[in-house]
């Protein structure tokens, strides 16, 4: 009896995972798979939309080569926005193409100063204008009317984007000019805002000068390459 009194049953050690643990692991794995699939799904859609845009512009222009070149001009324009935004430390999405409506990039930010916003907006037409200029130079050197017409459309596309209309780059620049013109200068003491002073309108004038200068160059390029041949 004494032996039975001292007997202690052996407890199972290191049993398998509980049902709850298994469910948690399955859920975590499903979340990783779902997130990855969603991410690559967006990448596929953007990649597919690029080629759909080429096909759409082929119907418009009647030439695969010209359609590809035109879409590449749009791509360079959007990359101009993206590069400047990245230079400012912002997160930028890959360009999303919409046939016959161009393309766009999404920029995540918690509010930008008018100066930073204007630089991002102007960077697209600047990059697109440089791409059109490259087409023009190569077209002249090779006597290629197709490249010169492509340059003309590139200048036109980027000049159009600088119209001071809300959803275009020019609309963003116009808003930046207005905000810079009205925005008061805040005087700080010890890191604490103490007084609102009269606006410093130098930045507004600089933005306006950059805007007018770039628009003028694009229009000049468009006029210089007008009526140079067929597709």
Which role fits each region the language model picked out?
Residues 1-231:
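Hydrophobic transmembrane alpha-helices and their immediate loop junctions
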């Amino acid at each position: 009896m004494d032996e039975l009194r001292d007997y202690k049953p052996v407890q199972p050690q290191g049993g398998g995972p509980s049902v709850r643990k298994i469910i948690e692991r399955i859920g975590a794995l499903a979340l990783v798979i779902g997130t990855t699939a969603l991410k690559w799904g967006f990448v596929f859609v953007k990649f597919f939309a690029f080629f759909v845009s080429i096909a759409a512009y082929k119907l418009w222009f009647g030439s695969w080569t010209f359609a590809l070149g035109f879409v590449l001009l749009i791509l360079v324009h959007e990359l101009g926005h993206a590069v400047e935004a990245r230079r400012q430390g912002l997160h930028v999405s890959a360009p999303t193409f919409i046939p016959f409506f161009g393309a766009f990039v999404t920029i995540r930010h918690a509010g930008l100063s008018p100066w930073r916003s204007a630089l991002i907006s102007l960077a697209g037409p600047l990059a697109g204008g440089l791409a059109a200029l490259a087409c023009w130079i190569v077209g002249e050197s090779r006597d290629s009317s197709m490249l010169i017409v492509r340059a003309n459309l590139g200048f036109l596309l980027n000049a159009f984007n600088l119209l001071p209309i809300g959803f275009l780059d020019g609309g963003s620049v116009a808003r930046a000019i207005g905000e810079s013109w009205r925005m008061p200068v805040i005087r700080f003491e010890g890191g604490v805002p103490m007084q609102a002073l009269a606006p410093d309108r130098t930045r507004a004038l600089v933005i306006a000068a950059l805007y007018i200068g770039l628009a003028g160059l694009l229009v000049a390029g468009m006029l210089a390459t007008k009526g140079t041949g067929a597709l």
